[in-house]
Each structure stands twice: as C-alpha cells, then as structure tokens.
C-alpha cells in the first residue's frame, strides 16, 4: 500500500518554525515533540517502592517544584495509597532509568495536572483493588490529563482502568506515542455501571501515533473535544493498531479537525459484525438536546451546536473487511453515521464538506504503511525496554487474533477485574501485577542521574553534579545518557518509515526529507504519492525536486 498523504511544502532542514527547537528526545514526534520537560533542572532519585511523602518516594519527587528530572534507583510496582496528581510542571519522568525490569504505578490513578511534562517507559496498571475495600475510592483513568499544554507520553503501558485507560486530551501541543492501552475493566465498580473504555483523544494540536489499543468495549478512542479546546480541535491520528473493540470503537469528533491515516484495524473474536466491525470512525455533532440549544440557558457546548468536523481519512486497513481497506470513506465513515442521532443534519452537503482532500496541519511523524505499523507497534510499543508478562499477552493476542483472558459475563477478551487473570490453583499470595525484578542501582556519587562509569567513559567528573546540566548543541549530558538507554529501540522502531509533516498550502506539496533515513531514495509525485523508482516525470527524492526521464 502506498503512503498517500499530502505533506508539507518545507523540508525539515528548511522549516522556519522548528529549526531552532530541539525535540524532547530523539524519536519525539508530533505536536508535543518540542516539550522540554525537566531539561537542565534538578535531579530527584526515587529510591523506594513505598508510597508516601518522605524523601525518595515517587510521590515526593512528583510533589517537588521547579524544573526537574526523576530517575529511579529501583524497579518494581509502586502501590499508591491515594490518587497522585502531579501539579508542578517542567518535569521529566525517566522510567527507562530504573535498574532491572522497570516501574509500575498501581492501585490509584496518576493524573497529569501540570504543563510541560515528559513521561517515558512507565507502566500504569490501576486495578480495582482499592474499590473492593472502599467503593467510593476512585473512578479513575489509568493515565489521565486534560486542560494543559506541552505533554509527550512515550512508551508507556496502561491497563485495568475503572474509567478510560489512556485519556490525555483537551490540551495544547500533546503527543502520545508508542504506548499500549489495554484491558480496561468492564464491571469494576464504576458508578455508571459497565465501562471498559480505551480513552478520550483530542486537543489543540494533538498527535497519537504508533499506539496499540486492545481489548476494550468502546472508545478506541473517543475523539473527544474539551470545552477549552472545542473551537480549535486539531488532531493527527496515524499508525495506531486497534484490536478487539467490542462495540462503538472510534467515534465522536464533534466539530473537530482530524487526520485518520494508516491505522490498522483488526476486529477481534467478539467485535460486532457489520457496520461497527467496519468502523474507522463514526463522527458526530453536538445536538440540540446535548447543548440545550432551544432552552433559555444553553450549556458550554452550544458554541459548537450542529458543527460537523472535518476529516482527512486515508490508508487505513481493516483485516476482516477488504472493502473498508479499499474505500475508507464509504464503509468506514459514511455508513457509520445514523442521521436520526445527529438531528438529521447528515446531508450530501455534509458529506462533501466533512471530507477534506488535504490533511489538517500536523507536526512531523515517521509514518509507515498500516501493515508496516502493525509489525512495528507490536515489536516496540509500550514499556518495551523490558516487556512485562501482561504486555506480552496483549501483543500475542493482537498478533494471533486471540483472547487469553475473559471475565464473568464478558465478551471474549474483556475483563471485570485484574483478578480475572488469576490461574486456577494459584495461592493466596498471587498478584495480577507482573513481577518486576530490580537490580542494584549503578553508583552515582554526585547524584546527577548519570552513573559514575558512564561519566568517566564520557570524560565527565563523577564528583561534579553540575555535569548533568552541561549541554551539547541540543541535549544536556543527563539527557544524552537517558536517551542512550533506549537508543536501539528508537532507531529500530522507525526503520522503514518516512518522516512526514503537513500544512494546508497552495502550490507544490513537497515531502519531508527523512531525518532518520536521509538517503532512502523513496520517490514521490508532486501530490505526495509514493511511486516506483522508475517513475518518469517530475518527482521528489529526499526532499529535492527532480525530473526523471
């Protein structure tokens, strides 16, 4: 399949907007790619798995203020005793620094309530254990955050939510990339009853790419505007893998501007047949009833009353229904809309205006075909520096079209509690949370986050804590160390892709030169379609226009 995108007029090297900015880390892409997080700030070491406010806990580090980076001197599961809301921004949470199998946050929600945050290689596996003790304990997301700005979530694994698994949305300049959102809990104790939802996605410049969304009843994702961003919702959703959605799948998008490009939809054993199994997305609107438009006091959503979104949809694959792959719009979009549910506003004019021929503006993302993305995501998504037992199950289920776990009264692949994973005959000490073994933390004499041995190898002084803040042309020494820990994953996951970005422009549309594979020699026509190497005519090769005869 060709990568069929209209892409930006400017090459990466010539981009006037971004040339002076440094990505959050190598491999950071999309609208949140220039988040700075804790760059150049203080370093806080998490030295214990206990939850509390004492020095060395994760909660203590989260509650600190000022520009900072959290590194881990231990691996394992941190069982929260109450919700943890991080309110002070300018922070990097470097899960890849944990010695051993990594970190998991459990039992209570972790909520992003700050600006300028980088989170990498973490697990958030909520569970309903706290609700069994106290039914009003929480109704949380696995990883949530909204009404903020400058956020990038990279290589995180999220599961067992009471509400949605992964709902980082309604903010400005955000990226969620290379994550796994799986096994939301169905009947886990939510006050509204059955849930089992993947997440709400959207924002004023929001990118979601190369994520795996598996084993959910609905919202895989919900395209969800927020009151503060509803008039400027711009979202790019590409190269995601969506498996075993049971009912609604992707829907919403009221008044949003959305690219849905090269995603891989794989219906599972109990995904509904017919239209919902064919679904790419079911766009909706804010109806009269929803907005109270005809009342004396319309609500906050009324400003988007009857406003249809605009969508660029191309290159998406459905493994069960080839007609959807061949014609994304007829079967995957138009046939999903029930006119009676949108105040009978779904007319031919609506069809014509909601479908756009150029993508909405989006920041650079290494883009694969949907089929390539399926393999890349299954190989590298989630907290994959060490992939734990649950992620292994989710990936294998997705690859093989299987459902390893099912809860009582649930559709195949859906669970009510993490305890539904308990094998027959397991003892009282069994835990659903995968064991994460720790190793001894490397010696870091000056506490700057970089091991002594690494500092010596790079000509630094292990007794000089300011070394970590020193910078080359782009990154601090601490960032260079943290980036090196996952360098191979970053390089391998992007192989075979082309770095694309897009603006709605006039004139010739020129593909980006790939920053990762600058000599890939892929050939494009002037409208952005990839063609064979022997194509004759005016083409673009590595960001340069040429004539092939």
Predicted regions and their residues:
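Extracellular calcium-associated, cysteine-rich motifs in secreted modular proteins
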Residues: 427-504
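Right-handed parallel beta-helix
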Residues: 90, 95, 115-126, 147-160, ...
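Acidic Gly/Asp/Thr-rich repetitive segments characteristic of extracellular carbohydrate-active
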Residues: 23-70, 525-531
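Residue-level detector of functionally pivotal "anchor" positions at catalytic/ligand-binding pockets or at interdomain
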Residues: 498-525
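Extracellular beta-strand/beta-solenoid scaffold signature
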Residues: 105-110, 132-144, 160-168, 189-203, ...
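Terminal processing/anchoring signals of secreted or surface-associated proteins
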Residues: 1, 20, 506-511, 528, ...
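Extracellular beta-rich repeat passengers
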Residues: 234, 238-426
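Extracellular beta-strand-rich solenoid/capping regions of secreted or surface-exposed proteins
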Residues: 58-66, 78-94, 103-120, 126-149, ...
């Amino acid at each position: 399949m060709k990568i069929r995108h209209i892409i930006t007029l400017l090459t990466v090297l010539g981009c006037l907007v971004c040339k002076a900015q440094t990505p959050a880390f190598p491999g950071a892409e999309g609208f949140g790619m220039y988040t700075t997080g804790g760059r150049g700030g203080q370093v806080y070491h998490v030295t214990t798995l206990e939850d509390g406010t004492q020095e060395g806990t994760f909660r203590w580090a989260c509650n600190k203020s000022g520009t900072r980076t959290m590194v881990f001197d231990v691996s394992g599961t941190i069982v929260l005793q109450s919700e943890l809301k991080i309110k002070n921004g300018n922070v990097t949470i470097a899960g890849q620094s944990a010695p051993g199998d990594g970190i998991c946050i459990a039992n209570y929600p972790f909520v992003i309530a700050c600006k300028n945050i980088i989170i990498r290689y973490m697990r958030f596996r909520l569970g309903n254990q706290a609700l069994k003790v106290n039914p009003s304990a929480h109704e949380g997301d696995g990883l949530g955050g909204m009404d903020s700005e400058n956020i990038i979530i990279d290589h995180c694994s999220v599961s067992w939510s009471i509400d949605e698994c992964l709902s980082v949305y309604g903010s400005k300049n955000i990226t969620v990339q290379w994550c796994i959102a799986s096994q939301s809990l169905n009947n886990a104790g939510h006050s509204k009853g059955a849930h089992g939802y993947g997440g709400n996605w959207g924002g004023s410049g929001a990118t979601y790419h190369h994520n795996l969304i598996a084993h959910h009843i609905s919202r895989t994702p919900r395209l969800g505007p927020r009151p503060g961003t509803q008039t400027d919702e711009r979202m790019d959703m590409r190269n995601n893998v969506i498996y075993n959605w049971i009912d609604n799948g992707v829907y919403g998008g009221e008044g949003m501007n959305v690219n849905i490009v090269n995603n891989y939809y794989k219906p599972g054993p109990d995904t509904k047949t017919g239209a919902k199994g064919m679904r790419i997305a079911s766009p909706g609107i804010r109806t009269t009833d929803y907005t109270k438009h005809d009342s004396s006091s319309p609500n906050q959503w009324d400003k988007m009353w009857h406003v249809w979104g605009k969508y660029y949809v191309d290159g998406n694959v459905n493994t069960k229904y080839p007609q959807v792959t061949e014609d994304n719009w007829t079967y995957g979009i138009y046939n999903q809309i029930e006119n009676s549910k949108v105040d009978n506003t779904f007319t031919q004019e609506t069809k014509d205006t909601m479908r756009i021929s150029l993508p909405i503006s989006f920041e650079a993302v290494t883009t694969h075909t949907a089929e390539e993305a399926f393999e890349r995501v299954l190989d590298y998504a989630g907290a994959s520096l060490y992939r734990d037992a649950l992620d292994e199950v989710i990936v294998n289920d997705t690859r093989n079209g299987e459902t390893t776990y099912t809860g009582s009264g649930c559709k195949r692949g859906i669970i009510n509690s993490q305890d539904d994973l308990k094998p027959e005959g397991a003892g009282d000490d069994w835990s659903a949370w995968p064991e994460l073994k720790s190793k001894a933390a490397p010696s870091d004499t000056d506490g700057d986050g970089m091991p002594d041995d690494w500092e010596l190898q790079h000509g630094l002084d292990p007794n000089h804590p300011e070394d970590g803040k020193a910078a080359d042309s782009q990154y601090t020494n601490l960032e260079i160390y943290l980036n090196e820990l996952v360098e191979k994953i970053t390089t391998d996951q992007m192989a075979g892709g082309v770095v694309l970005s897009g603006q709605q422009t006039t004139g010739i549309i020129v593909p980006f030169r790939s920053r990762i594979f600058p000599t890939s020699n892929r050939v494009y026509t002037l409208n952005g379609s990839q063609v064979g190497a022997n194509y004759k005519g005016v083409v673009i090769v590595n960001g340069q226009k040429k004539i092939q005869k």
